[in-house]
Regions:
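C-terminal active-site/capping subdomain that shapes the small-molecule cofactor and substrate pocket
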Residues: 58-155
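Active-site-proximal loop/hinge segments within enzyme catalytic domains
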Residues: 1-92
């Protein structure tokens, strides 16, 4: 965010000083015509864990947050599925992580995040929303929920 703030300040100053010449989009010289971005559907926002490393999963969440929001399904020990939207994550590089299906790690970590082991590291979930509930911090979620026996749906 700091880089963006510096860039905005620098750009505004260059405009004030007359160092920037604006070019209308219609006059830009490109080899390809401009294309609109593809429409995002609910299915597009599902995190398909088997297709992601820790880096791509983190970037997927960032790209869809805050709206429409990336989501996944958690499986309870009795087989019940729960939809969870994920809004904010960080990543931790780690050599010993999941190779095939991602693993939901126990919540006994100091920063109180929901952790998922993926190829290339651990994804720390900081903000989430369960179906029918309000958006919450992972620490609040973990205080009221025992995740023993829960799994991430990796189908």
């Amino acid at each position: 965010m700091m880089l963006g703030a510096e860039l905005v300040t620098e750009t505004v100053q260059n405009i004030i000083d007359g160092k920037v010449t604006p070019i209308p989009q219609e006059q830009m010289h490109t080899d390809e015509p401009l294309r609109p971005a593809p429409k995002i559907f609910r299915e597009t926002c599902e995190i398909k864990w088997s297709e992601h490393t820790v880096d791509t999963a983190h970037n997927f969440v960032r790209g869809l947050s805050p709206y429409p929001g990336a989501w996944t399904t958690l499986l309870s020990p009795d087989g019940k599925e729960t939809v969870m939207k994920i809004y904010r994550t960080t990543k931790e590089a780690c050599t010993k992580t999941a190779q095939d299906c991602p693993t939901l790690l126990p919540s006994a970590n100091s920063d109180k995040t929901l952790r998922i082991a993926l190829p290339g590291g651990i994804l720390h979930i900081h903000e989430l929303q369960l179906a029918g509930k309000k958006r919450m911090n992972a620490s609040d979620f973990l205080r009221g929920t025992s995740l023993e026996g829960w799994k991430v749906n990796c189908d």
